């Protein structure tokens, strides 16, 4: 609660917008729901799917715009969860300070001897949740963090947020999008750097 930026985040890609007073079009208001947790609006899209619910086209639009006739309007939100953000180095720095440094304060003299290691139970990003089927109108859950789009764009030269639909549906062309690989590659690397490298360095420096 004191440091919400250190809490784990998820990206919710949903057909049903959150009703917080900011919705503009009547169509959005009619299909809206109350949010279950703290969140921030990220983007919305005009999505065109074919008869097999494969992705034909998409474009990022504003909240005030409706999707074109025959298309669907989808929304993306960043939500906060209760676990530490394992893709954010600052969050893991704080985690180390309130756990590992306390262990060191009390038992540091035994590090490398009777205390050979410190156990952390299954550190992980938020579990992914896909659509149940391609024409499903529920929500997709994906790992996310505040600056993911910024670091993604810096590494790959393309915006993740501008192209979210290609993570959700198969392309009608049958050609896989490299953005899917980029997304999984980048989130995995962010996790490895923020958690594994960070805690590994501390352990090496402290003889465990």
Where are these regions (language model features)?
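Anion (oxyanion) recognition and catalysis
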Residues: 200, 204
């Amino acid at each position: 609660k004191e440091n919400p930026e250190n809490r784990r985040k998820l990206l919710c890609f949903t057909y049903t917008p959150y009703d917080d007073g900011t919705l503009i079009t009547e169509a959005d208001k009619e299909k809206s729901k109350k949010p279950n947790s703290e969140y921030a609006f990220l983007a919305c899209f005009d999505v065109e799917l074919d008869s097999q619910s494969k992705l034909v086209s998409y474009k990022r639009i504003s909240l005030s715009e409706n999707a074109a006739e025959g298309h669907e309007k989808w929304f993306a939100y960043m939500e906060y969860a209760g676990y530490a953000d394992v893709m954010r180095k600052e969050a893991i720095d704080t985690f180390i300070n309130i756990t590992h440094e306390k262990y060191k304060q009390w038992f540091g003299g035994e590090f490398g001897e009777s205390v050979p290691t410190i156990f952390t139970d299954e550190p992980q990003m938020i579990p992914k949740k896909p659509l149940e089927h391609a024409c499903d109108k529920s929500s997709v859950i994906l790992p996310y963090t505040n600056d993911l789009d910024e670091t993604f764009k810096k590494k790959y030269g393309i915006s993740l947020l501008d192209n979210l639909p290609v993570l959700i549906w198969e392309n009608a062309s049958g050609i896989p999008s490299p953005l899917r690989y980029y997304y999984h590659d980048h989130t995995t690397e962010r996790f490895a750097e923020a958690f594994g490298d960070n805690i590994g360095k501390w352990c090496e420096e402290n003889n465990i």
